Amino acid sequence: MEKILVTGGTVFVSRYIAEYYVKKGYEVYVLNRNHKPQSEGVHLIEADRHNLGDVLKGKHFDVVMDVTAYTGEDVNLLLDALGSFDDYILISSRAVYPETEDQPFMEETAIGENKFWGKYGTNKIEAETVLQKRVPNAYILRPPYLYGPMNNVYRETFVFDCAMQNRKFYLPKDGSMKLQFFHVKDLCRFMDVILEMKQRFLLKTG
């Protein structure tokens, strides 16, 4: 049985990913501070990713799914603490693309500061850069807005609620802004595919 390490595991995306792979029969470990209820079937590694010590030493994972890396330091600290692993998937963000670039964004689209996302986007770029230098065969995914079960942000659900209740809601400015959403289950299915291909990829998922 393959072992998967999921960083986080208690909120929305990381929790969904952990539960998804438990259901698929993987041995799933979650790395978090144990401040929230844990999902059924996961193995908890209780630690702060910024102060990991030796909790991961001597452990081997077939796949590391890094959902909670927001800076280059986050990536460095995890890599320094890990024992060994075969594949590494970083969940980055579409925020790495400048707002001035034409959509749809492509993998070869230039990355850079986005005035709407600010440091969140530039920090994600830093995380990607660190990972590419240290783990050249890593996978980097750049999803747009993620939605689905267990979402802790009242965002797309607000729009759905308004539609279901026949309530008005207002679009920013002239309503021409384009946003793309990607279901968290499709993100998992996408990871299923790339793990079967075993090549180096840097991909946007929306």
Give the positions of each predicted feature:
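N-terminal Rossmann NAD(P)H-binding glycine-rich loop of SDR-like oxidoreductase domains
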Residues: 4-24
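N-terminal Rossmann-fold cofactor-binding loop
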Residues: 31-35, 48-49
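Rossmann-fold cofactor-recognition segment
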Residues: 41-51, 68-70
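Short amphipathic alpha-helix with an adjacent loop that forms part of the alpha/beta core around
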Residues: 52-60
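NAD(P)-cofactor binding segment of oxidoreductase domains
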Residues: 59-105, 111, 115, 122-130
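Conserved beta-loop-beta element that borders a ligand/cofactor-binding pocket
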Residues: 128-150
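Glycine-rich "substrate-gating" loop/helix at the edge of Rossmann-like oxidoreductase active sites
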Residues: 144-153, 173-185
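Alpha-helical substrate-binding/gating segment
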Residues: 160-170, 177-206
